[in-house]
Each structure stands twice: as C-alpha cells, then as structure tokens.
C-alpha cells in the first residue's frame, strides 16, 4: 500500500497527483488525499507543520483497511511531512520516500522559494494562494517551530528511507538532499536524478516506477 503526500498547492484532484497515483497502482494499492487547506479539504494549511496529523490519519486509515505493509511517498512539502511522520510515529510505516524535500526550514535562496514565502507570509499573498491556487493558508507563524527534515531523518531508522531529488530542482538545490543523506548515514539511500526539476510535475513515469519497485522491495 502506498500513501501519497502531495506538495504545497497540490490536491488529490490535481492532474500531476493523479498521474503519480496511477503510476504507483502498478505496484500496489494507493491512498491519496488533500492536505488541510488544499483543494476540497477543510481547514487552513500550516505549510508542513500540522500536516503531519493529516498523513498520520491517512496511514492509520490504510492500516484499518487491512493493509499490513504501508509505504509513504511524499513530494516537496509532502516529502518533509513524510520524514517527520516517520520520525514521530514509530512503526507507522514500513518504507519512506521523500522526493524534492527541503533539508531545513525558512529557505529563501532561490527565486521560487522567495515567491512562496511571499504567498505564505503576506496577507495579499495568502489571497493569491486562496483564489489562484485553491490553497488556504493559516496566518499564524509556527509556534513552536516543528522538527526540521534534517533533524527528523536520524530518527527514522531502522525504517527504510529513500531520498530522491533532481539536480535541476529550481526550489531546493542539491545541498538539501545531500544534507538529508548525510543525516541518514548508512540508513538511507539517495537518488540524484539528472535533469529532473521539482516534485510531482518533474517525476517521470520511469522514476515513479523505480520508486514503486523500491517500496515493494523494502516494505514487502
């Protein structure tokens, strides 16, 4: 069973999320959902903080359906959520894949991330996000600041971990996946994908197939 965690401004009905789900169905059952504040889901996005509760609920539901083995596959924001979920919820998942995730919070080193921070932190940005991207963002800052992805990674072992990142990612350069891989040491794998951009939009069917095979091979 795969539980797919989409990126920021994604939703279960977005074409790129549906494509990911279709690709993974060749390897097992798939659960998709929209994080809080995204698409038709209620509430407001906390941009990766309380979203860990949403993923936990989806994984729990997958278990209740009778699936003994569950792997999470997260993209960008969803990738950071998958890392934190695996660190905080012991034995909740049997394999974790994080695609295009940041290593640390508050990164503004690229133009796309500076635009994203404008969407999140400015009132006018949140209006654009609501009506332009169907994503409703909570106005409050994080308090406390959640465990960062790079801090979460060492807590995931012995659960199998795969970190996937494109070397042409315009949001988070390759120092992010390398930091995550260093934190995982010999407990994780790193795939640096030549020419790949960011998150679901950039994940080819061939890559999704390899991810599906990896999860099946590790989670059983």
Residue ranges and their predicted role:
Residues 46-65:
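Alpha/beta-hydrolase active-site loop
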């Amino acid at each position: 069973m795969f539980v797919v965690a989409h990126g920021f401004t994604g939703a279960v009905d977005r074409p790129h999320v549906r494509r990911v789900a279709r690709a993974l169905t060749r390897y097992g059952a798939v659960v998709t959902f929209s994080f809080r504040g995204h698409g038709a889901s209620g509430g407001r996005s906390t941009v990766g903080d309380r979203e860990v509760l949403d993923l936990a609920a989806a994984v729990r539901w997958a278990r209740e359906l009778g699936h003994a083995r569950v792997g999470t596959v997260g993209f960008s924001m969803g990738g950071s959520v998958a890392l934190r979920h695996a660190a905080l919820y012991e034995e909740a998942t049997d394999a974790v894949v994080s695609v295009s995730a940041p290593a640390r919070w508050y990164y503004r080193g690229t133009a796309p991330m500076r635009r994203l921070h404008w969407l999140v932190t400015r009132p006018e940005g949140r209006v654009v996000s609501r009506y332009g991207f169907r994503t409703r963002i909570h106005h409050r800052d994080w308090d406390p600041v959640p465990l960062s992805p790079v801090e979460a990674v060492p807590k995931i072992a012995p659960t199998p971990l795969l970190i996937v990142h494109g070397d042409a990612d315009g949001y988070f350069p390759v120092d992010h996946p390398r930091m995550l891989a260093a934190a995982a040491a010999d407990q994780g794998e790193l795939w640096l994908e030549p020419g790949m951009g960011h998150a679901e939009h950039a994940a080819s069917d061939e890559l999704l197939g390899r991810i599906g095979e990896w999860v099946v091979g590790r989670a059983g």
